[in-house]
Amino acid sequence: MRTPVRALSPLLAAVAVLASWAVCGTAAAQNCPVQYEQLTKALKESVKASGGPSNGGFDNNEWAVVVTRDGGICAVTMSGGKPTDQWLGSRAIAAEKANTANALSLDKTALSTANLYAGAAPGGYLFGLVTTDPPATTLISAGDPKTYGSASDPLVGKHLGGVVVFGGGLALYNQQELVGALGVSGDTSCADHNVAWRVRHALGLDHVPGGVSPDHNDAIIYDMLPDKTSASGYGHPQCGGSEADVAMQIHAGFVPKWAQVMIK
């Protein structure tokens, strides 16, 4: 007996959608500034839980996400052996951090997500920024959870969007231009920034042309005042561990002399 064409239509539609996802994912991977294997290796070597150094926070496993210059997700990975080795919610946060750093950086000026904290706080000059690009939340839980963090992660090829204004997102630069961005999440935001800094350096995509920190890059700036404002306007609060110490050691952060007593 022949199957009615009408009955086949939903199946054919589903196959077409799956095929389009595969094509999008393949195209995104081809245009990615990093390869999945490179990103995974760099992440594992930058996180204590997977054999790397401490970053001053909880030393949890981490997620890392890279977007292309147009904001499409092209790589998602993790430092643990399975998705539940990391905070599951941090997969989306990492993607949103990457989106933010890419969207707000330029060829000549980098802004890390850490640089946005003070400005986006109530009363700040960027207050309301987090509402400007809501994430496509239906994408976060789509696909097979067992593939999260793999080369075939369902987020690859998608534009999730989202804006995050705390540490962990960095723009990626080759020797000529901005080529995308990296987001890391799974620990304190201060530790996430340190991990992202290490990963970007390991990938060779840290040719930052300029930025708002005193070191003229996108380093995290620990200059929050007692009234919770930032001396520079681009500051980020400390997170309670030794993250600021680590940041200074790896040149990922700037702490004014008056604030250094606060991390002793």
Name what the model sees in each region.
Residues 23-29:
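Sec/Tat signal peptide C-region and signal peptidase I cleavage site
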Residues 10-22:
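Bacterial N-terminal signal peptides
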Residues 1-3, 17, 167:
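Accessible peptide chain termini
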Residues 1-13:
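Bacterial N-terminal signal peptides that target proteins for export
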Residues 30-264:
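Flexible, solvent-exposed loop/hinge segments and secondary-structure transition points
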